[in-house]
């Protein structure tokens, strides 16, 4: 699965160490988005959909950009 730089940065910010934990945190974050924050909602939805297609082993192999 290919993630772009923006997606990887979002994942890095909310990463709990597990794929399902990250999905949960992204869903939780979406609850706090304002109606005009559509770009972040679209970005996070795309990341969640891609994460659903990964296995936990594939997620563990992901490399996040350095801080």
Q: Predicted regions: what is each one?
A:
Residues 1-25:
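N-terminal acidic leader/helix
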Residues 22, 26, 44-47:
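Generic structural signal of hydrophobic/aromatic residues within well-ordered alpha-helices
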Residues 35-62:
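Short, charge-rich amphipathic interface segments used for partner binding and complex assembly
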Residues 65:
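Charged, terminal alpha-helix-loop-beta segments
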């Amino acid at each position: 699965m290919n993630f772009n730089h923006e997606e990887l940065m979002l994942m890095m910010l909310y990463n709990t160490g597990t794929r399902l934990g990250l999905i949960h945190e992204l869903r939780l974050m979406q609850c706090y988005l304002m109606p005009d924050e559509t770009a972040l909602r679209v970005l996070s939805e795309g990341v969640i959909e891609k994460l659903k297609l990964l296995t936990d082993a594939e997620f563990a192999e992901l490399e996040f950009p350095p801080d």
